[in-house]
Amino acid sequence: LLLLDEPSMGLAPIFIREIFKIIQEIQKTGTTVLLIEQNAKMALSISNRAYVLETGSVVLSGTGQELLESDEIQKAYLGG
């Protein structure tokens, strides 16, 4: 299990992309990754499962792809 808390915080976009590539490589080895991340689009794009928390409670869950495609998520969290 690898726990990552905001690995993109404060980094330039080029470094963020590299960090997420590394996270994907770690996933491919079979390591479970628990990622807490404010960059929702990046996090959801590599997630098998995703949870949206509001004030400490799970308000939405699904696959990363399901949440990326969700109108509710687009409007509330992804600026869509």
Across the structure, where does each feature detected by a protein language model lie?
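Short acidic-hydrophobic catalytic motif
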Residues: 65-69
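H-loop/switch region of ABC-family ATPase nucleotide-binding domains
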Residues: 37-38
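Short coil-to-helix N-cap segments within the nucleotide-binding domains
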Residues: 10-11, 26
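Catalytic Walker B motif of ABC-type/P-loop ATPase nucleotide-binding domains
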Residues: 2-6
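A short, surface-exposed alpha-helical micro-motif characterized by mixed small hydrophobic
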Residues: 43-45
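Short, glycine/charged-rich "phosphate-handling" switch motifs in NTP-dependent
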Residues: 49, 61
